[in-house]
Amino acid sequence: MVPKPASTISLYRISQPADPATAPNATPPSFDPGFTDEDAHIILRSSDNIQYRMHAVVLRTASGFFRNMLALPRPVSPEAATQQSDSIALDESSQVLGKLFRMISGLKCGDLNSFDVFQGILKAAHKYDMEGVVETLRRLITLVDLQDQPLKIYALAAQYGWEQEAIAASKRTLALPIHQEKYDAVLETIPSAYLLRLLKLHRKRKICFEKNVIMPGAKRTKFFKLKECSCEEEGDRFSNAEGMWKLAYAMFESMDRRVDGEELLEGRWKSCLQGNEKFCARCNMSTKDIESRVNDFIASLPSTI
């Protein structure tokens, strides 16, 4: 479910917080160098006490949230009347707000290569109803250098209902053994419909690959869709297909580790052959034959949700 923008009233209530400099163990507030224009009379403060002087017109234009807030009548007290500017405390850190405010101000925001910062900016943009920033981030999610965390990208796209972005990210998750416990925390954040589709994709690839490698027959098992020979006749190089079964299960274990099949495409399965280039004297199937079939099998598997 897409997070809803924050309530205007909730921000208005914290628009005159206690002086941060008097809070216990507080770091004295300082200004972001990019937002020190004294003609900007709205001061926003991050959770780590970095302040930003913002022009009202920028906030009104970029944010439905601030547009509504600034339209409200402001309570005036004798103490507030002596202040030149309000200081509005926000929940987000300076890592997030610094980039967010630069985006709405037309300034360079630097790289967005940290997933946590990217996610934080997106959440803040939704919270403050900044549709332009949300749309920009949606376009960037498949372009920025975040591809080392494909499962998190998939989860984020799923949370916001971004179908095409989720489809693109699902392919990159194939390099991950998502059934391992270390991925549980991320999987728990994925909406159930998208989670089911992702789990089905990973499982379907493994099942389809296994069916291509081992084909039970009425009389004997066939390997790698070999029609000319079962490679299971007594007297073959591997009696009772022991070698073939060993090779097949080694490939299955490889697909458990990386369901994208990258290990198989790299030919790591050849270490199981112990130098044997021929499997069966009858059909003359060789390492190259198996390699070709394996590559074809992997290419034929579904690759996205």
What does each model-identified segment do?
Residues 71, 75, 105, 109, ...:
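Short amphipathic alpha-helices and their capping/turn residues within compact interaction modules
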Residues 2-6, 136, 142, 146-305:
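Acidic, serine/threonine- and proline-rich low-complexity regulatory tracts
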Residues 1-59, 95, 102-116, 304:
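N-terminal BTB/POZ boundary and linker segment
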Residues 41-81, 129:
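Alpha-helical oligomerization interface recognition
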